[in-house]
Amino acid sequence: MGKKLLIVANHFATIYKFRKELVSKLVEEGYDVIISLPFSPDIEKIKDLGVRVIDTKVDRKSLNPIKDLKLLNDYKNLIKEEKPDLVLAYTIKCNIYGGMACRLYGVPFMANVTGLGSAYYRGGMLKNIVSSLYKIGLKNAKGVFFENIANARVLIDDKTINDDQAIVLKGAGVNLQQFEYCEMPSDKVVKFLFIGRIMAEKGVNEL
């Protein structure tokens, strides 16, 4: 059996819809992949990729510190039991508490920042709390992946991470076998369709 990789995430879609190809490649390369996330009716789709899935409750929107402490404890127990060679985390709470748990046990850790969240853009006390937690969770990260340079610069300028920790990716990628390439239409007028939330942090101001 190859090296054990633990992936922690907060939702089925985070892994299956956006990271399915990565997971399949890791399994193909011989990694023993374990995925920790909240169970959903579609969880068998992830298991079919050849990985083991562990049900871990993650309340994405809760501000209850008791729930967050429970999540930290769940990650500590999971890492202690599974003894992974590397932990890869996605999304804010998983990055923070997964990183903290890895620090306690000296397990190599990498984080993927899929977005900074509204707290960073709104500022105030909540932003300061999230920033402080991120500094603790990401302190020993071997690498922190970003999908755009703007998010990376925010955490670097806030001294949440060091320059050498930041790794900017060219997007999450598109499976061209599932979504085939099409030629541009011959129309001279180019029309854009924006599908997303009407929020500044989602790029509305750049349209």
Question: Language-model segments: which ranges?
Answer:
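Nucleotide-sugar donor phosphate/pyrophosphate-binding loop at the beta->alpha transition
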Residues: Y16-F18, I66-N73, P108-M110, S118-N140
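An amphipathic, basic-hydrophobic alpha-helix
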Residues: V58-L86, I96, M100, L104, ...
